[in-house]
């Protein structure tokens, strides 16, 4: 049994989250709301919302936790070639551009669009409204790939101190979300961020260098990261030295 949270209730300790034996590993609580204050409190404690349409708000703290250490991000030879092309395009104000926070809500809605083999989405209008509020406060950001001024891929997440929590990504052209992630990783690394929270284990994330760590280790690293000053100047930088 998990607790039901009223508006002013604190989150329970993450150690009380359900386990594999309970059938919903990582489920911590239900209820409360998606206010900016509640979302920030959740992320500061290693908790995130995830629920389907028709369900109450469900709060999770998974164990193990999937994370991407910046130094472990994998760039294939083909992706590296593409990134160099985009670097040159950015410098020359060409067809391909990377932008941060240019169309945050559009990125969220693209991430919410139905995908092959999936019946629905967890990114509801309430989720979009909640994270858009965080974006206006400077705590949620998007990394976007544009082609001929059309949004063709990207991702969004939450930033607190030196911690970035990845939420969802989408792609409309080959490798678009990987490209947006690569530029985000480059930017975050330049600002002292060492880890991106990926929440749950997937083969796709593992292929990019993400790995599972224990919740205890994650919370320890999280505490250090969120104590750092907030990153303020969100502007993409080139991946490589371009001649």
From Swiss-Prot:
Report the EC code(s) recorded for this entry.
2.3.2.6
Q: Which Gene3D superfamilies match?
A: Leucyl/phenylalanyl-tRNA-protein transferase, C-terminal domain, Leucyl/phenylalanyl-tRNA-protein transferase, N-terminal domain
Listed A to Z, the keywords are: Acyltransferase, Cytoplasm, Transferase
GO CC terms, sorted: cytoplasm
Q: Which GO molecular function, any one, fits this protein according to its record?
A: leucyl-tRNA--protein transferase activity
Q: Which GO terms describe its biological process?
A: protein catabolic process
Q: Which InterPro entries match?
A: Acyl_CoA_acyltransferase, Leu/Phe-tRNA_Trfase, Leu/Phe-tRNA_Trfase_C, Leu/Phe-tRNA_Trfase_N
| Pfam family for this entry, one | Leu_Phe_trans
Q: Where in the cell is it found?
A: Cytoplasm
Going by the record, the broad EC class of this enzyme is transferase
Catalysed reaction per UniProt?
N-terminal L-lysyl-[protein] + L-leucyl-tRNA(Leu) = N-terminal L-leucyl-L-lysyl-[protein] + tRNA(Leu) + H(+); N-terminal L-arginyl-[protein] + L-leucyl-tRNA(Leu) = N-terminal L-leucyl-L-arginyl-[protein] + tRNA(Leu) + H(+); L-phenylalanyl-tRNA(Phe) + an N-terminal L-alpha-aminoacyl-[protein] = an N-terminal L-phenylalanyl-L-alpha-aminoacyl-[protein] + tRNA(Phe)
Q: What role is this protein assigned?
A: Functions in the N-end rule pathway of protein degradation where it conjugates Leu, Phe and, less efficiently, Met from aminoacyl-tRNAs to the N-termini of proteins containing an N-terminal arginine or lysine.
Q: Show the NCBIfam families listed in the entry.
A: aat
> What family does this belong to?
Belongs to the L/F-transferase family.
Protein name as annotated: Leucyl/phenylalanyl-tRNA--protein transferase
The lineage is:
Bacteria, Pseudomonadati, Pseudomonadota, Betaproteobacteria, Burkholderiales
Protein's gene: aat
